[in-house]
Amino acid sequence: MEMTPNERAEWTSHLHTPVIFNHHAPLQVESSTIQPVDLNPIKSTTKAADNKERVLILTPLKDASRYLSKYFELVSKLTYPHELIDLAFLISDTTDDTLAVLAAELDRIQKRTDGVAFRSVMIVEKDFGFVLSQDVEDRHGYAAQAPRRKAMARARNYLLATALKPEHSWVYWRDVDIVDSPERIIEDLTAHDKDIIVPSMDKQPAKHCDGARADPL
């Protein structure tokens, strides 16, 4: 029997949705183009390592070959279980041998059998047509900050969107030029049980605003 639109509206008025689900009977979906993703089992807790929570370390790279040796020296010493860590890199607008050096360092790390090798590694290449002087003064000058930050944001968005998987509980953004960091930094960060943690300091006071300056917080 066909219902008029008014009759159907009255029939389903007690429902929040016009679709009736029987939660006790599984619905078999045959189409291979439909992929369900259940994020409910994925948790982020203060006992991340004990609960075997996966961590994704993301690092954008641009003309970074000279930093990679130190980068891997530090990340190889991380005490968080490496079998729970995935690495992902985005290489953009690079003019040096960053890709070759990265590949060599990863090959060396991933061949190790002493627990240093990571669960997986992804290398993403995406150019944005952004060119910036490698001179420190130019890179950190006020005029360069808006286009530089815009390019950095685009690179990070591409990297996150490409590398993040449903099984990841945590994302750790790590710059390539860090020269020192605690070996337990992942455990320290997850122990705070916060959605987002950022540093609250500025070691480069700005002097461009009519004599005003931003001091360290």
Indicate where each model-derived feature is located.
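N-proximal low-complexity "stem/linker" segments adjacent to membrane-targeting elements
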Residues: 1-77
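Short, acidic, metal-binding catalytic loop of nucleotide-sugar glycosyltransferases
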Residues: 50, 73-84, 94, 104-112
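Short loop->beta transition adjacent to catalytic acidic/histidine clusters or analogous donor-positioning motifs
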Residues: 54-55, 78-89, 96, 114, ...
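Mobile, glycine-rich extracellular loop/lid and propeptide segments
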Residues: 59-64, 105, 171-172, 186-187
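Catalytic phosphate/metal-binding cores of nucleic-acid and nucleotide-processing enzymes, i.e., regions
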Residues: 69-71, 105-106, 153-161, 178-179, ...
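Active-site-proximal specificity loops/subdomain of glycosyltransferases
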Residues: 97-168
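Conserved catalytic core of nucleotide-sugar-dependent glycosyltransferases
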Residues: 160, 178-217
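The conserved acidic donor/metal-binding loop of glycosyltransferases
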Residues: 170-179
